[in-house]
């Protein structure tokens, strides 16, 4: 038997007819159309909105509002871990511009912050807006220095 376009058939049950509700008892979905007896969920129109608890005071209104949330002007940093600095040349000066040039950071939108995840084996002079305590100790233990911009 050759595979021809006119000999193709759908799998059994792949193409089902649309269920037509409310078209008589014999159709299988007549009378209450599968919505049960009475009540809000059997009525036409949209279902209740998310968070609606049937008239009871909903949770999002029972819980108090938090002061100063969300933060109005949160400090945002471009973060780089110490382990990412291992690939750089020893004795070089590391800044946000040099990291963008080397492809470690994609955009210089926010000031640079160095985090202390990983180990540092190369001696570097790192210029950043902020350092974590562990990052500062690891840079200085490798013989490097940490500099804050003016």
From Swiss-Prot:
One Gene Ontology term, aspect cellular component: cytosolic large ribosomal subunit
The protein's name in its UniProt record: Large ribosomal subunit protein uL15
Region named Disordered: 1-57
Residue runs in coiled coils: none
Main function: Binds to the 23S rRNA.
Pfam families xref list: Ribosomal_L27A
Lineage: Bacteria, Bacillati, Cyanobacteriota, Cyanophyceae, Synechococcales
Entries under HAMAP family matching the protein: Ribosomal_uL15
Family per similarity comment: Belongs to the universal ribosomal protein uL15 family.
Keyword terms of this UniProt record: Ribonucleoprotein, Ribosomal protein, RNA-binding, rRNA-binding
InterPro entries linked: Ribosomal_uL15, Ribosomal_uL15/eL18, Ribosomal_uL15/eL18_sf, Ribosomal_uL15_bac-type, Ribosomal_uL15_CS
Composition skew (Basic residues), residue ranges: 12-23
């Amino acid at each position: 038997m050759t595979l021809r376009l006119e000999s193709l058939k759908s799998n059994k049950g792949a193409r089902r007819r649309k269920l037509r509700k409310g078209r008589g008892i014999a159709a299988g979905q007549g009378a209450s159309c599968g919505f049960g007896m009475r009540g809000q969920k059997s009525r036409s129109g949209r279902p209740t909105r998310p968070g609606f608890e049937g008239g009871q005071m909903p949770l999002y209104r029972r819980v108090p509002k938090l002061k100063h949330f969300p933060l109005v002007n949160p400090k945002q940093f471009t973060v780089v871990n110490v382990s990412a600095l291992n690939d750089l040349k020893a004795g070089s000066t590391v800044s946000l511009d040099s990291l963008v040039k080397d492809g470690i950071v994609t955009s210089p939108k926010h000031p640079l912050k160095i985090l202390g995840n990983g180990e540092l084996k190369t001696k570097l002079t790192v210029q950043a807006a902020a350092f974590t305590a562990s990052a500062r100790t690891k840079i200085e233990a490798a013989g490097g220095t940490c500099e804050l911009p003016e």
